[in-house]
């Protein structure tokens, strides 16, 4: 029998995308988790040459049968009790996502203390980039299984089927998720801050309601890919090590902003002007120190 998590092992099964070049999905999640003391077993939902923000991308998309086969191998070798966490990100196939639901249940049978962190990657800035058929699977089958949810503002609107255009609407949405069994919900970014400022929110059942204002970096039209994936992995790590949600939230944002700052600094003209997709890849490896030792500059505001 494989050693169980009762011995203090920190191991993540991470089911999301993989790219050969660049940093999104498992490529951006694995390194920070390892730096913060976790073993990571990446299971790829797709394997692309690069992320989809380039002019072209190539590579295969995994299906639910391939996922089931790989997981079966883990199960037959009695490895399931080793996992302390499940992390899921980009999944583009509704049947693949449904299979993830079966995986959550099997992992919980092997380790009732498993923590499931779900990043429901579906779109951003009003643009849906997965098949709409994923929505009911997330809403009805996956969301109720999650312990921690890390959507962006647009994904919150997709899941709740309500616009989120005010802070009152944010807390209504948070309550919608809590009623479905999710203990901790973090909206990783929203446009509800002042001009030039993103606003992130956190809500925990019987816990604090928090917000952090995050100044945008670089040119006004500069967009980075993989930041949500990085956010989810950092939040997973810090929430395991501390139950102080304000501190967890602050450290997550601190490391994320440090990575973005280093990335912007490497851009031509600081990102003011045209920037190629390859130039916008996150400077992850170069940010090792900021990931291991986050310097908190942006403090959480308690709103309850």
Predicted regions and their residues:
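Conserved phosphate/ATP/ADP-binding segment of small-molecule kinases
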Residues: 129-211, 218-220, 241-246
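Short glycine/threonine-rich catalytic loop with a Thr-x-Gly-x-Asp
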Residues: 214-235
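Charged C-terminal helix
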Residues: 246-304
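Glycine-rich phosphate/adenosyl-contacting loop at the front of the ribokinase-like
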Residues: 1-62, 291-304
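A short helix->loop->beta-strand "cap" motif at the edges of active sites that frequently abuts
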Residues: 107-116, 180-183
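N-terminal glycine-rich phosphate/adenylate-binding segment common to multiple enzyme folds
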Residues: 80-108, 120-124
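Glycine-rich, highly charged phosphate/nucleotide-binding loops
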Residues: 58-76
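Short glycine/serine- and small hydrophobic-enriched flexible loop segments
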Residues: 233-241, 254, 258
């Amino acid at each position: 029998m494989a050693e169980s998590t009762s011995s203090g092992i920190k191991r993540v099964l991470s089911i999301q995308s993989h790219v050969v070049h660049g940093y999104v999905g498992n490529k951006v999640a694995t390194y920070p988790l390892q730096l913060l003391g976790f073993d990571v077993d990446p299971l790829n939902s797709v394997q692309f040459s690069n992320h989809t923000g380039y002019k072209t991308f190539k590579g295969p998309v995994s299906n639910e049968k391939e996922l089931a086969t790989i997981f079966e191998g883990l199960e037959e070798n009695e490895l399931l009790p080793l996992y302390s966490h499940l992390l899921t990100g980009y999944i583009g196939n509704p049947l693949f996502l449904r299979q993830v639901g079966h995986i959550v249940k099997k992992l919980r049978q092997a380790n009732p203390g498993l923590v499931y962190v779900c990043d429901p990657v579906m779109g951003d800035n009003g643009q849906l980039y997965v098949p709409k058929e994923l929505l009911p699977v997330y809403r009805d089958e996956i969301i109720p299984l999650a312990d921690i949810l890390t959507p962006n503002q647009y994904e919150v609107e997709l899941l709740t089927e309500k616009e989120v255009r005010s802070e009152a609407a944010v807390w209504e949405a948070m309550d919608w998720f809590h009623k479905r069994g999710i203990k901790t919900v973090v909206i990783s970014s929203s446009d509800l801050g002042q001009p030039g400022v993103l606003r992130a929110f956190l809500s925990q059942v019987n816990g604090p309601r928090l917000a952090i204002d995050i100044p945008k970096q670089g040119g006004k039209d500069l967009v980075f890919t993989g930041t949500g994936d990085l956010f989810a992995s950092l939040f997973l790590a810090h929430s395991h090590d501390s139950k102080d949600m304000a501190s967890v939230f602050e450290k997550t944002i601190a490391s994320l902003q440090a990575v973005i700052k280093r990335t912007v600094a490497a851009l031509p003209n600081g990102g003011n002007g045209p920037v190629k997709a390859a130039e916008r890849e996150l400077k992850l490896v170069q940010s090792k120190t900021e990931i291991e030792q986050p310097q908190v500059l942006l403090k959480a505001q308690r709103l309850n």
